[in-house]
């Protein structure tokens, strides 16, 4: 019998469930860690994690990027890693039950869980999972990600997958919600052309760099979202070496697509919609064809990023 641990009972301070020496030498003394079980390797799929400031458009970006990969003929799985479980609703047209909801319903006896209980097919064949999370202020988000991957492997649902996209909540980069980085080969940060999201992006980049000491993940770059201009993002990139990999303009049709519970690939055809679709397809193609790891940038100290941004 496979009984999973209630996530509310997990320790969330210090180096819980981790090799302590690795913790100390990796992300720094006192960091909170969730150690990757070597048996939970996702396999041959290309794995991407999407981070960014809360409300910046990560779920919109993730869902449309998932569709873009599917339009290239790839088998795609999107995993939402937010207790709000709203990552995939433009793909599935509904709010899905989360992995944690399903596990709680069977008292964490995972052998009673069926794939159809937590995996749903969305637009253009994109498979969707909402990991969910423990109640606010309790438990560990990293546990949730780990158990989601474990269930997917137990049901052999990763064997026929080409691309996995983790859509990770807000700008939290604690040991728990940084755990998708342990599975990923590339991470991207969604940011607008403003101080707050670039400041958050800089701190996320530092977390990704810390994880890259012990894991294969590398920062692919910044996706400029909801931005007419990119001058501040580009200034940040010139200083840090973290490149901009895509530019998605501030278009009202993108907002409307969320209200219609649709991806941009389902919206009525217009020149501006086609331009954004093509940008997603270009990004998906570049990510799929990338042979060499990107050059690691050098995030700035908080004071330096504060002094850098703004108009002369």
UniProtKB/Swiss-Prot annotation:
Cofactor note: Binds 1 [4Fe-4S] cluster per dimer.
EC number(s) per entry: 1.3.7.7
Any one GO molecular function term: oxidoreductase activity, acting on iron-sulfur proteins as donors
Residue sites binding [4Fe-4S] cluster per the record: 140, 174
InterPro entries referenced in this protein's UniProt entry, alphabetically: NifH/chlL_CS, NifH/frxC, P-loop_NTPase, Protochlorophyllide_ATP-bd
Superkingdom per UniProt: Bacteria
Gene3D superfamilies given in the database record: P-loop containing nucleotide triphosphate hydrolases
UniProt keyword terms in alphabetical order: 4Fe-4S, ATP-binding, Bacteriochlorophyll biosynthesis, Chlorophyll biosynthesis, Iron, Iron-sulfur, Magnesium, Metal-binding, Nucleotide-binding, Oxidoreductase, Photosynthesis
Binding-site positions, Mg(2+): 59
GO biological process, one term: photosynthesis, dark reaction
Cofactors required: [4Fe-4S] cluster
A Pfam family the protein falls into: Fer4_NifH
Reactions catalysed: chlorophyllide a + oxidized 2[4Fe-4S]-[ferredoxin] + 2 ADP + 2 phosphate = protochlorophyllide a + reduced 2[4Fe-4S]-[ferredoxin] + 2 ATP + 2 H2O
Metabolic or biological pathway: Porphyrin-containing compound metabolism; bacteriochlorophyll biosynthesis (light-independent)
Residue numbers binding ATP: 55-60, 84, 225-226, 249-251
Subunit structure: Homodimer. Protochlorophyllide reductase is composed of three subunits; BchL, BchN and BchB.
Function: Component of the dark-operative protochlorophyllide reductase (DPOR) that uses Mg-ATP and reduced ferredoxin to reduce ring D of protochlorophyllide (Pchlide) to form chlorophyllide a (Chlide). This reaction is light-independent. The L component serves as a unique electron donor to the NB-component of the complex, and binds Mg-ATP.
NCBIfam families registered for this protein in UniProt: DPOR_bchL
Annotated family: Belongs to the NifH/BchL/ChlL family.
The protein, known as: Light-independent protochlorophyllide reductase iron-sulfur ATP-binding protein
Gene: bchL
